């Protein structure tokens, strides 16, 4: 019932619902005393669990866990499982500068994109993917969801399906981006045929759409080949540079 509420009332993505489920499952196993029922849950029980997780997680990650708990406890009260409001959990604060900066230096990102040999295996593809992430802030999940018909050439618009927010985004495309997309399609993508509607395909057999995890791999590969020093090789830093 709780998962259904997260989907139907809050519209959360599958990934977000899975994170909620992991927190709730762990709380029910480690947050409750043996044979304790949810109806007997107390604030000290919740505080002990949060203290336990605080020894395992960063404050940033703990914020998400506390948010999941609040949501679940509100649901339990609405359903009559618990009588008292127990969702007033203090959220751990994070401070500016506590986490590494998310954005990369613009000059380094530009150097990375320029360094890609488009004549190498999947060179046009990788150049196009990284260009879209840097200039339009696309997530890996949004990149792999793009199709050949996601591009409206006449209107110069890219249709992006946002998996995280379950919404559609229509992005105006700059002339440079249109040229990069057209070059990729003409010189590399169309050679793979029309069996798959996805815009970006695997470079090796078996033929098929590229997977989300592969976006991170190609980013690390291109950084390594470029010989550029970047503070961390997390591909999500590209979209935060946007």
Report the location of each language-model feature:
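Conserved catalytic core of the tyrosine transesterase superfamily
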Residues: 1-242
